[in-house]
Amino acid sequence: MTHFEFYFDISSPWTYLAFSRVEGVAERCGVDIDWKPVLVGGVFNAVNETVYEQRANPHPVKVRYYVKDLQDWARFCGIEIGAPPVFPVRAVNLMRAALVALDAGCLPAFSRTAFHAYWGELRDVSQPEELAEICVRVGLDPAETVEKIAGDEIKSRLRAN
């Protein structure tokens, strides 16, 4: 079967929007999804370091348009996107855990739960107790997940994506 790669980071509202629709698109097109958790901060560091300056000194008009555009797309996708109190969030452990979820066959449920926790419930998903709760919600053992995300194999896989 044909497949396509879907790169995403829980800390990105734009990948949350795409995630909310990707499974339906794949089903309609008869393709499989090759899930690729990434750290979008690493991508920014490689291709657009100015993003940090733009965040530190935002232009008010651009910010208003950005928020409006994001909310328009969220309504279109049928999801809620709020303004998390911690943004950007340090999502490295969460994205490593996404690889554990991929191996366990529950990555879509894990990611859906994590996206909603951060963007819908506005929780600080960088905190260990939040990661543990997300794991429990999707049937992953939190202690086992924490052990795996500390290992070199998972770290290397996330860097490779």
State each model region's role.
Residues 2-5, 10-32, 99, 104-106, ...:
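C-terminal cap of thioredoxin/glutaredoxin-like
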